[in-house]
């Protein structure tokens, strides 16, 4: 009926389709967060850096109308307020050159990255 090559190809295709849901499940995490700074949260002892944004570092200052403001603390505080008591869902997108997990994180189906850059 089927040639050996056809059976091998069918087997490989089947493996590929079976593997997709497992990988997608492994890339999602949810849990009580610890906010590190404006673009990084820790869930279950793992840091997740938000994709698509670069918030000020926690000790970073900025100037607004010649006044020094603590923009790193402001960014973190905005994130703390937005998350509140909600449990975020983070979907891993990649790992950067510094070996950090890059993820899109959501609260109530709203992107935290988009919220922070609005």
Give residue spans per PLM region.
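Small beta-barrel nucleic-acid-binding modules, primarily SNase/OB-fold domains
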Residues: 2-118
């Amino acid at each position: 009926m089927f040639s050996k090559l056809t059976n091998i190809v069918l087997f490989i295709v089947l493996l590929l389709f079976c593997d997709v849901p497992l990988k997608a499940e492994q890339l999602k995490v949810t849990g009580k967060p610890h906010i590190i700074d404006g673009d990084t949260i820790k869930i279950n002892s793992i840091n997740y850096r938000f994709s698509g944004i670069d918030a000020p570092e926690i000790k970073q200052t900025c100037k607004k109308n010649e006044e020094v403001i603590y923009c790193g603390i402001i960014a973190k505080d905005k994130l703390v307020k937005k998350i509140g008591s909600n449990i975020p869902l983070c979907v891993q997108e990649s790992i950067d050159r510094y070996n950090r997990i890059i993820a899109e994180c959501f609260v109530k189906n709203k992107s935290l990255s988009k919220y922070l850059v609005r």
